């Protein structure tokens, strides 16, 4: 049989537990509900990092995320910088004051909080947004 109930990524992050492997999420049927999103993101990131890339010049990127994903995103961006020193990524962890400060998922961070906490700090002029379009996941530079 197939499971119908999965704990969201928040449960693992709040408990300080590792996110389960991809097999745990079966077909990622609850992805839009935040179930398995961190696992999928990390696995896609690591697969992309394993591929060779040509990078010309220095790249500066700002990444904005919520408090829950902040530590993992920071770790991943540090790994990116170690492998590609010409890429300088600054991670901005934004507290969600709009919803009372106790909601840490990045998808619920509001523009109001991003502006209030990042104004004058986003210096690169480049950011990336994860896009789920036509069933395909890709990273869209902005």
Predicted regions and their residues:
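Auxiliary Fe-S-binding modules of radical SAM enzymes
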Residues: 1-142
């Amino acid at each position: 049989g197939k499971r119908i109930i999965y704990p969201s990524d928040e449960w693992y992050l709040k408990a300080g537990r590792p996110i389960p492997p991809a097999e745990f999420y079966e077909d990622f049927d609850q992805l839009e509900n935040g179930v398995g999103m961190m696992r999928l993101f990390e696995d896609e990131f690591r697969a992309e990092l394993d591929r060779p890339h040509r990078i010309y010049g220095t790249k500066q990127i700002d990444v904005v995320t919520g408090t829950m994903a902040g530590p993992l995103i920071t770790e991943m961006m540090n790994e990116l910088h170690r492998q590609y020193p010409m890429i300088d990524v600054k991670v901005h962890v934004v507290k969600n004051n709009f919803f009372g400060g106790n909601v840490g998922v990045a998808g619920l961070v509001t523009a109001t909080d991003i502006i209030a906490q990042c104004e004058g700090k986003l210096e690169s002029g480049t950011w990336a947004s994860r896009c789920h379009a036509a069933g395909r996941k890709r990273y869209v530079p902005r």
